[in-house]
Amino acid sequence: MHKYVTIDDIYKMIELLPDEKQNPVDETGDCLYTNEDGDHCIAGEIIRMLGYDLPDFDDFQNTIPLGELIDNLHANDFDDEAVEMLHIGQKVADRLTHAGDPLAWAMAKRDMVLFFNRSRKEEIAQRRLQAGH
């Protein structure tokens, strides 16, 4: 049984990822969760690091949308913010991979951290408002 995954868990995984990496793509240019060598895209690598199994290279699920993949993994223990944070990273890494940027993951990590920080600031502001400050 997996624990409930939050943006805090995703944030901890981001720090462990390399900067100089791109998402794997197939011969048609589709980004993959897993390539033939077993490398993963940024969202897939984080999901794997959290203890979930990813589709193999030849699995039809290898190119489905992230939300659908999480549903198929029965990973209903990902909160909405965690899924959104993964989606942000995936979108940036996919776009920069297609542009040939060797630092695709670095930029994706940056945007994920920005999302995390924004979320935390909103949470603090809401607590202050509720406390009457």
Report each predicted region and the residues it spans.
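Hydrophobic/aromatic-lined pockets within catalytic cores
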Residues: E15-P18, I47, G51
